[in-house]
From Swiss-Prot:
GO MF annotation, one: hydroxymethylbilane synthase activity
KW Transmembrane helix (keyword) present: no
Protein name: Porphobilinogen deaminase
Protein's organism: Clostridium beijerinckii (strain ATCC 51743 / NCIMB 8052) (Clostridium acetobutylicum)
Gene Ontology biological-process annotations: protoporphyrinogen IX biosynthetic process
Subunit details: Monomer.
Pathway(s) annotated for this protein in UniProt: Porphyrin-containing compound metabolism; protoporphyrin-IX biosynthesis; coproporphyrinogen-III from 5-aminolevulinate: step 2/4
Catalytic activity: 4 porphobilinogen + H2O = hydroxymethylbilane + 4 NH4(+)
Family of this protein: Belongs to the HMBS family.
The protein's role, per its UniProt record: Tetrapolymerization of the monopyrrole PBG into the hydroxymethylbilane pre-uroporphyrinogen in several discrete steps.
SUPFAM superfamilies, per the entry: Periplasmic binding protein-like II, Porphobilinogen deaminase (hydroxymethylbilane synthase), C-terminal domain
Co-factor(s): dipyrromethane
Chain positions found as S-(dipyrrolylmethanemethyl)cysteine: 238
Length: 291
């Protein structure tokens, strides 16, 4: 096969994540590939919250156009940015091995979360993160902060914030985990649905699909599909406070989810056969809605 073209966002993290997939293509199949860098609408509108401009799907749409026009053979996404409903022409051919799922605190002077000063100013534009922070410490002042990892770190200094919340996965992929002050327990501070997972999207008719499919990680697929099933049942998006964490426990799958029902934050968990992972996601959603 000739060289593949892999579409991705322009940020350093997006490119690093794409390079992980490109290396795997080379190592497994001896296939060369190149990046196609795309500035998405979500990247262009950094001064407005995602909830106000249409949600995380804005990071995907422009890339899908490149796939549809066959300018790219595949695309690498952070699965937490991928809407649960894809247009019928596309599919997620593979979910690769998942990175650390946890959220982390990066604080000024490396001060642990519990020791942050009263009224400490913390940057995050995530409704999920902001609400969980307030549940843990109601005194905190939460301010919006968007942009890639580097931009947020710069804004933290410029705006003299006491800290920011980021996903561990991105920092680890960028080899910047040394700046992490503290990791949050994912069963206490629930991550975003599919956090830490990369997905390879392509046209259903793509000749490259057979290679992408062989890059799938079975445990990542189970946990991500379970969490996305939970999200789909609740019709969750970035307008919603929604999060989920799941892990394989032998033949079982354990999942805990969080959701906002009329201003009340509900957290529930479930354990069941991992082969019923899609149904477990639905059951957990129903369990939350029964409250």
């Amino acid at each position: 096969m000739n060289k593949l073209t892999i579409a991705t966002r322009k940020s350093k993290l997006a490119q690093t994540q794409t390079e992980i997939i490109m290396k795997s293509l080379k190592d497994k199949f001896n296939i060369d590939s190149e990046k196609m860098l795309i500035v998405t609408e979500g990247d262009r509108k950094l001064d407005v919250s995602l909830a106000k401009i249409g949600g995380k799907g804005l990071f995907v749409k422009d890339i899908e156009i490149a796939l549809l026009e066959k300018r790219a053979d595949g695309a690498v996404h952070s699965m937490k940015d991928v809407p649960y409903e894809l247009s019928h022409e596309f599919e997620i051919a593979a979910i690769t091995e998942r990175e650390d799922i946890r959220d982390v605190l990066i604080s000024k002077d490396n001060i642990p979360f519990k020791e942050l000063r009263k009224g400490a100013i913390i940057g995050t534009s995530s409704i999920r993160r902001a609400c969980q922070l307030k549940l843990m410490r109601n005194d905190l002042d939460i301010v919006p902060i968007r942009g890639n990892v580097q931009t947020r770190l710069e804004k933290m200094k410029e705006q003299n914030l006491d800290g920011i919340i980021l996903a561990s996965a991105g920092l680890k992929r960028l080899n910047e985990e040394d700046i992490i002050t503290e990791y949050f327990d994912p069963k206490v501070f629930i991550p975003a649905v599919a956090q830490g997972a990369l997905g390879i999207e392509c046209l259903k008719t793509s000749s490259a699909k057979k290679y992408f499919e062989k890059m799938e990680d079975s445990n990542a697929k189970l946990t991500v599909e379970a969490e996305r099933s939970f999200m789909r049942m609740l019709n969750g998006d970035c307008h919603s406070l929604i999060g989920a964490y799941s892990e394989i426990q032998g033949n079982d799958l354990y999942m805990i989810g969080i959701y906002d029902i009329g201003g009340r934050i509900v957290k529930k968990d479930i354990l069941g056969d991992k082969n019923d992972h899609i149904e477990l996601g639905r059951k957990l959603a129903n369990k939350i809605l029964e409250i």
